[in-house]
Amino acid sequence: MNDCIFCKIIKGELPSNTIYEDEIVKVIMSIDPVTNGHLLVLPKEHCVNILDVKEEFLTHSFKIIRDNLYPLLKEKLNCEGLTLAENNFLGQAIRHFHIHLVPRYENDNADFVGNKDMLKELDEVFSLLTK
C-alpha cells in the first residue's frame, strides 16, 4: 500500500526504532507510548485487521513475544507484566494491523477503565454471543 506509514517503515523508507525484525515481522517502538518500552508488532505484509492477517504471522508473532520480547522487556526495563492489545479502528490512525505490547509497572496509571453501566447489558450480550 503506497500511503501506509507502517509499510514505508517496513520498506525502510521512513525511520523507526526497530527492536526486532525477521522475514515475517518487524517490531518497533511506539512514538506515542502508553508506558516505557511500548512496542508495536507489525506484519510485514499489509493487512487492515485481524481477519486479514495470515495465520503464520499470528503464530510467529506470539512466539516472538513469548520467547524474545517479553523476556527482553522484563530484563531491561523490569516490567511486572505485559498488556497486549489490538485496537483496530478504535483511535487507530494507521490502517495496518499491529499488536501493541505495553509493559506494565506498579502504579503506571495505564489501567483499562471499565464501564459499570455495561453490566446491565451483560446477559443480553452473552445471549447474543452464545446463540
Regions inferred by a protein language model and the residue ranges of each:
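HIT superfamily nucleotide-processing domains
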Residues: M1-K131
